[in-house]
């Protein structure tokens, strides 16, 4: 697969995983997990997914473990949403970038404000 296609597939996988994790998973361990980066291998067989999660290292490790446990479900969901010949195996890891935590905080605050406006449109 050429580099541009690899980047497009990586971005599509990131968008879909973000949607599934944020809105369709019921596991409380992943409530504050955010997909920050996806790198799909050139043969499209493997995807390395970086996850940022607020909280201490123990909480982050629990979120990664929950996502690893749900990898089969997530992969099936990706298969139903994306037109790919091969849906990659998903490998989750913690994003260790210090700027990511502040970005996650910002995104969570924005999501709460948006949700509040949807529930109370007159405000």
UniProtKB/Swiss-Prot annotation:
Gene3D superfamilies: 3.30.300.20. It comes from the Bacteria. Disulfide bonds: none annotated. It is found in: Cytoplasm. Transmembrane segments: none annotated. The keyword Transcription regulation does not apply. One of its GO terms (molecular function) is ribosomal small subunit binding. PROSITE patterns: RBFA. Keywords: Cytoplasm, Ribosome biogenesis. GO terms for cellular component: cytosol. GO terms for biological process: maturation of SSU-rRNA. The keyword Lipoprotein does not apply. Monomer. Binds 30S ribosomal subunits, but not 50S ribosomal subunits or 70S ribosomes. Belongs to the RbfA family. One of several proteins that assist in the late maturation steps of the functional core of the 30S ribosomal subunit. Associates with free 30S ribosomal subunits (but not with 30S subunits that are part of 70S ribosomes or polysomes). Required for efficient processing of 16S rRNA. May interact with the 5'-terminal helix region of 16S rRNA. This is Ribosome-binding factor A. It comes from Solibacter usitatus (strain Ellin6076).
């Amino acid at each position: 697969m050429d580099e541009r296609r690899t980047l497009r597939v990586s971005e599509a996988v990131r968008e879909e995983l973000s949607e599934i994790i944020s809105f369709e998973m019921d596991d409380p361990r992943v409530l504050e997990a955010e997909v920050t980066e996806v790198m799909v291998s050139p043969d499209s067989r493997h995807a390395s997914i970086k996850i940022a999660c607020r909280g201490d290292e123990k909480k982050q490790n629990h979120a990664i473990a929950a996502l690893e446990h749900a990898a089969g479900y997530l992969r099936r969901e990706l298969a139903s949403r994306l037109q790919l010949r091969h849906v990659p195996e998903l490998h989750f890891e913690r994003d260790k970038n210090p700027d990511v935590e502040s970005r996650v905080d910002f995104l969570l605050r924005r999501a709460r404000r948006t949700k509040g406006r949807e529930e109370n449109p007159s405000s």
